[in-house]
Amino acid sequence: MARFQTVTKHARFVYSPYSATEMQGFAQVLADSIRARIQGGQNIYDQAAAPLKPGQSGRRGYPDYKSARGLKPIRDWTWSGHTLRCLKVLTANENRAAIGFLDEALSGRRQTASQIAAFNNRREAQWGVSPRDRQAVLVAFQARPFVMLKAA
């Protein structure tokens, strides 16, 4: 399987003081922050996500199956890890960068990572930018040296 490469384009009109590679870096900071938050079992409001539903009438439920595999029984989008591994910076140019899920299906499955993410996000809003994610990107923006030019 070929490794994914972010598509870096150059815009015809540039409104931003950042290069395409800098925008890709900022988007990667955001993607890493979102991935860490989802793996921590938090929603887009930086609160604990709703608990998983237990089994009914003496049957084992999804939390029981996750515990049996050695995983945390919380809503963290991890079973095989494929969905969160597909969270990438898809495109970047001087004006904007887009993050999302690759349209790859794990072998033996019908649904792609983006379909699984959309389905999981309908249950509990975890895919999106939380206040802590926004703060992480602002720190990355402010860490970049800013140069002001004065008119003579």
Sequence positions of predicted segments:
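Short, Lys/Arg-rich flexible segments
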Residues: 1-152
